[in-house]
A protein has these predicted regions:
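Residue-level recognition of short, solvent-exposed, well-ordered loop/turn junctions
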Residues: 1-2, 222
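Short, charged beta-turn/beta-strand-edge "cap" motif at the junction between a beta-strand
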Residues: 6, 12-15, 233-236
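Extended, loop-rich substrate-binding clefts of extracytoplasmic carbohydrate-active enzymes
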Residues: 9-63
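A short, structured loop/turn motif at beta-sheet edges
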Residues: 30-37, 60-65, 94, 165, ...
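Short solvent-exposed strand-capping/beta-turn motif centered on an Asx-Ser/Thr pair
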Residues: 73-77, 164, 236
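Active-site/ligand-binding surface loops and adjacent short beta/alpha elements
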Residues: 89-177
C-alpha cells in the first residue's frame, strides 16, 4: 500500500487551520420554541486542544430581525484560550454583490502574507478598502479583517448592504466591545462558481486570525468563567 500523509489542517494548501474547532461538530437541541432555538456542544480535549468548554448558541427571531447569542463556559480546571467568530453570508437579492452598496465603519485593516497570516495593521485611509462612507463594492475582492470599528450610540457597530435600485437593505450588528474585529469575504475564491460573489460574508469576531499564536485580543477564560455576547441581522 502506498504511503499516505494525514493532516488535521483544515487549510492544507496554506499550511494552517481555518474556521475553528466546532464547524463540523455535532450540536444538540437544548431548547426550542416557535421563534427561537438553543443548540449546545461540549468541546473536549483533542489533538492540538487540551481544554473543556461547554458551548451554546441561541438563535431568536424578533420583530427587528435575528439575534444570535453564543456562549462559552470553561468547565475545565485550567485557564482556556478562546476566540469566537461567526460566518453569516448577507445578500439583498439575486444580483451579484459587486452591484451592492456596502458600508463598513472600520478605520483599520489587517495586512496579511500570501498564506493569509497577519503581518500588521494598516489604516484604510485613501485605499479601496475604505467603506466608512457607503459605496458600490464593484470588482473589489475582499477577504479582509477590519478593526478600529466605530460603534453607534447603543454600543454596536453595523455593516450595511444596500441595493441601489430595489431599496433592499440588510444590516449586521454586533456588540463593539465583545467583537472588536470583523472579517469581510466576497466569496470570489469559493470552489463552486455559482456561489462566488452571490453574497458577502460579514463575520463578527472577538479576535483576529492567528490570535492563538499572536495573543492579539485573545480571550482567556478562567475555570468557571463564561463568555456571552450577542450579534444579529436586521432587514431594512
Amino acid at each position: 500500500m502506498p504511503a499516505r500523509t494525514i493532516s488535521s489542517l483544515t487549510e492544507p494548501d496554506r499550511g494552517h487551520a481555518i474556521h475553528g474547532l466546532v464547524r463540523w461538530a455535532i450540536w444538540s437541541v437544548l431548547e426550542q420554541a416557535e421563534d427561537a432555538v438553543t443548540l449546545v456542544c461540549r468541546l473536549r480535549p483533542q489533538q492540538g486542544w487540551e481544554w473543556s468548554l461547554d458551548l451554546s448558541v441561541t438563535y431568536a427571531l424578533t420583530a427587528s430581525g435575528l439575534i444570535v447569542t453564543p456562549c462559552a463556559r470553561n468547565v475545565g480546571t485550567a485557564a482556556a484560550p478562546f476566540g469566537f467568530g461567526a460566518h453569516p453570508y448577507l445578500s439583498v437579492g439575486e444580483d451579484r454583490v459587486d452591484e451592492v452598496e456596502v458600508a463598513i465603519p472600520a478605520a483599520s485593516l489587517l495586512e496579511v502574507d500570501d498564506r493569509l497570516l497577519p503581518v500588521g495593521l494598516a489604516a484604510v485611509d485613501d485605499t479601496d478598502h475604505d467603506f466608512r462612507e457607503p459605496r458600490l463594492l464593484g470588482e473589489l475582492t475582499l477577504d479582509t479583517a477590519y478593526t478600529d470599528v466605530v460603534a453607534d450610540a447603543d454600543g454596536c457597530w453595523r455593516v450595511t448592504l444596500a441595493h441601489p435600485h430595489t431599496g433592499r437593505v440588510v444590516t449586521l450588528w454586533a456588540d463593539a466591545t465583545a467583537y472588536p474585529w470583523l472579517q469581510v469575504f466576497t466569496g470570489d475564491s469559493l470552489p463552486l462558481p455559482a456561489r462566488r460573489a452571490s453574497g458577502i460574508a460579514v463575520e463578527p469576531m472577538t479576535c483576529p486570525p492567528d490570535a492563538f499564536n499572536t495573543g492579539d485580543d485573545l480571550l482567556v477564560l478562567a475555570p468557571g468563567q463564561e463568555f456571552a455576547a450577542p450579534w444579529g441581522i436586521t432587514p431594512g
